[in-house]
Amino acid sequence: MITDIVGYSKLSGDNQDVALELLKEHDKILFDLHDKYNGNILKNRGDGVISAFNSSSDCIRCAVEIQRKLKRRNALNIKERNLNIRIGIHYGEYVKDGNEIHGECINFASILEPLAPHGGIAISEQLADIVDKKNDIYI
């Protein structure tokens, strides 16, 4: 899973205090839900994370709950304080080399992430097929 806060660079340039507040909220939500779904945050990229899960179903459930939680959070805030993220998900093996993470799954998820709408999730067709065959998540 790769996540990215939409518009974070502009926000941090416009109002660094608000940007840091939103980043703290973002981190709390993502870290708590990764714990709940047994996700492992491999790298915190500042305005997003790269993470891995033992189960693709858990990864997708985590992503859905992240977006639901953010949608509820945004409904209670003014537009300028909305926190929207995009999520890209693929599956496969990766290699962690110090602070760097390599692998086709990382590359593909990073291509998918910007294709997701604000507050959305983009998953690869291959992953959708795998999860669909398990019949435990409707995509």
Model-derived features with residue positions:
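Catalytic NTP-binding/metal-coordinating core of nucleotidyl cyclase/transferase enzymes
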Residues: 1-62, 69
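Catalytic beta-strand-to-alpha-helix segment of the class III nucleotidyl cyclase homology domain
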Residues: 28-31, 50-139
